[in-house]
Structure formats: C-alpha cells, structure tokens
C-alpha cells in the first residue's frame, strides 16, 4: 500500500500500481466474474474514514471495421470476440423507488438464466439504480448504456447544453467503475426519427439547418466531450440505430428491426437488406400475465377485444390506425406457429 499526505481542501491524487496475473471479469457464458476491492483509508489525528471501490479487470473493445459486407459492429472482451445475446432494459416500475435490490437481482438473474450476456439500458428510461449495475457485475451481463435522450427533438441553447454536460458527467462518474458497463450511446432513435419518420419535413429549410446543427453539436460534440472528461476508456456510439436512415444501409452498424411486429412475418428478418451487423432493438407486443390483469380488468371484460383491453393496448397500425391491429397480429402468429387458444387465459 502507498501513503500520501493531504492538505486542507480538495486533493487530487493519482496512484499507479501493477496487478500481477489478475483474475479477469468475463461476461455470462465465457468465464467467471471476478471482482477486486480497492480500499482508501484517510486518517487524521482524531478520526479516520475508509472507502472501498469494487472493480473488475477486463478490456472491452467495440470493433468497427470495413469488410466485404459493409462495416462491422461487434464486441471483443479480453481479446475474445463475443456474440451478444440480450434485451432492452426499461424502468422496472413506473415508480422506480418502489423496487428493491432483490427486484433487480430477480430480473437480471432471469436474463442470465436465459443465456443473455448484455442488456441495453434504453434511452427513454433512466440512468439505473446502483443495484442494477451491481447485479450485472456479479452476473456477467454487459451493459449498453444510452444517455437519457429518446425519440424526440431536443434544444441546443447554451443553458440546456450546460445542463446536459452536468448530467452526463455526473452519471458517467457514478457508473464508470462497473466492469459490466461496455459502452456509452448518445440517444435512442433521435436521428432516425428526424431523418426517416418525416419530422424534418414539418420544418422550413432555415429551421432544418438550425436543428441539424444543434443535433450534431449535442450528440457529436457536447455529450462525447463530457463523457471523455470522466471516462476515456469506453467506446461512444452517437445514436442508436446508426443504420436505416440518412442513406446508411443495415450492413454498416446497429439496427432497430420491427418487421416481425410491424411487417407481419418472421421472414422479414431474413431478407438480405434487413440483416444488420448488430441488432440493438427488436420486439413483439405482449399481454401482462393474468395476475396483473385481474387487478384492473373486470371479469366481464376479460377478452382481447374488450373496451378495457383495447384502451390499454393502444398499439395501432401506422397506416390504418386499426385499434385491433395488435390482437390480429398476435392471432396470426398463434395460428401459424402455435395453436388457437380455447379461452382468454390460454390466449394470455
């Protein structure tokens, strides 16, 4: 151990040391999740204090290389290429403080038992509680961390940018020592929503130029610069998805593929133009379990097309706005790949 003398006020001390043959941190399915403890003791003539920082020893590289298909996007852990298997993580409760450490352990544990080794903290949610990252550390679940920006058009005035800088630096400083944290991402769908969903067509040319300059400054300058001041060891991904808009094909990076849900058939995934290098988001609608439904649905409304169920679903087709679109899609897949349910409980 090393000793240092402190002066009154803030002290900034850098301590270099070498770990000889350290045990490494690996993701789920690739090895053990060894965690090391580093202790700092502060002593005065009359009192003392200790601080313990847990950390894992590992390297994570995001590989972006030009190749015969386009440009790769994959993760390399401790020199070994990893096939990422996982899901998107949204807030565990509409009232997050209602949840405990055991709730995070249960949910992340279920992901690990399912063979997952990565969770993407979705940008429309929040910077998660320490219990989530601790659980991921111990289970070997790598974390893709979005900044808290999603599906919207954000301002770029100086006061707002100063607030963003403070928010980003605070959260990066809080989370950077977790070995599970694999990469930072600027936002969820802010670029594709603007360039591909028609939002830019609602603006004048002058407004577009102003907003696009602000978009670039926020996610390509302000946020990565704020991250680098607290953590210059991790890859920064400006926006997810990085493909499917602005003329960038799926062969160049990560994609959000909703063709199975929106397009209607699993075969959509297999079309060459839909095969992405990293599938960072996809999904399918689902019902809550019966335990949850019985809390708010009256017995006489326990059917897919009831007013109560349709009001809670609100999953419409983008074109027809058919309120029963979700049920029709579910039934189509059940008929094709499973069986026709005999009652509502079996349907759920």
Predicted regions and their residues:
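Residue-level preference for short coil/turn positions at secondary-structure junctions
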Residues: 32, 177, 232, 273-274
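Secreted/periplasmic carbohydrate-active enzymes, especially glycoside hydrolases
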Residues: 1-119, 138, 258
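Generic, ordered loop/turn and secondary-structure boundary motif
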Residues: 26-27, 61, 148-150, 155, ...
